[in-house]
């Protein structure tokens, strides 16, 4: 196709691609992935029969789902756990556990309603400290929009996912705060609701905040839930009560092993 070549040359001012070099590169990629190409549905079907455990991973949150998200600020295919069965080609009833990953605060990339959003120095500080090296887009490096934990949106997201467990991440980031606001409701047209509204009402929503005391210390390296500072545990338990789903995992650092498991 000549069009991509013309775009490459005249729009991006890049050298023309040599077809032989491109073919060689693609052949190398083919050889890399060839051992992993198979009938995925059959492969997983046999694994289930053998009693093996299967982990399916999704990306993006419930609010990006084209059917149940904040349309039109959504993606092109379903982001809900139920769609995992369709994508993998396995029966829905084989999915026994659904782990929903929630940050201990909120962040977002791009436009769309963001009720608990914060601005200015408050947002800059959380953005700088957040994530693994700051809250910036992985591909573009774009600064993410920042906000406090939103119980209303998270409760809705967990419900749509069919959550059995919540993994509560980047909790260590909040250790610098004296007080931590949490969005526990939305005020819309003078009335307060704790249920996630339809999109046109969401645009009018103002956050109802409850402030919890911070723990003002570094919690990295802690291995058991009981060792966490009291105010840290209270924060987790307050969120759990508000969203109505069990927080069974808490991450307190960027490492693979920086996870505290809670008993139900």
What are these regions (language model features)?
Residues 4-264:
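Non-transmembrane, aqueous-exposed alpha-helical and coiled segments at domain scale
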């Amino acid at each position: 196709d000549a069009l991509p070549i013309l775009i490459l040359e005249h729009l991006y001012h890049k050298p023309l691609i040599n077809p032989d070099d491109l073919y060689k590169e693609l052949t190398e990629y083919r050889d890399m992935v060839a051992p992993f190409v198979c009938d995925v549905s059959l492969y997983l079907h046999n694994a289930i029969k053998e009693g093996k455990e299967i982990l399916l991973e999704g990306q993006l949150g419930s609010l990006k789902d084209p059917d149940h998200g904040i349309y039109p600020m959504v993606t092109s295919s379903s982001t809900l756990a139920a769609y995992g069965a369709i994508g993998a080609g396995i029966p829905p009833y084989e999915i026994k556990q659904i782990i929903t990953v929630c940050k201990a605060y909120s962040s977002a990339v791009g436009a769309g309603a963001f009720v608990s959003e914060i601005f200015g120095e408050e947002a800059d500080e959380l953005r700088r400290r957040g994530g693994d090296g700051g809250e910036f887009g992985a591909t573009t490096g774009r600064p993410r929009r920042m906000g406090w934990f939103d119980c209303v949106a998270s409760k809705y997201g967990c419900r749509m996912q069919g959550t059995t467990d919540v993994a509560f991440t980047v909790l260590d980031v909040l250790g610098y705060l004296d007080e931590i606001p949490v969005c526990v409701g939305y005020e819309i047209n003078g009335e307060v609701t704790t249920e996630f509204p339809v999109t046109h009402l969401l645009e009018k929503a103002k956050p109802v905040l409850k402030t919890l005391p911070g723990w003002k210390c570094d919690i990295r390296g802690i291995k058991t839930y009981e060792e966490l500072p009291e105010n840290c545990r209270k924060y987790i338990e307050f969120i759990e009560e508000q969203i109505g789903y069990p927080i069974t995992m808490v991450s307190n650092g960027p490492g693979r092993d920086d996870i505290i498991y809670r008993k139900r």
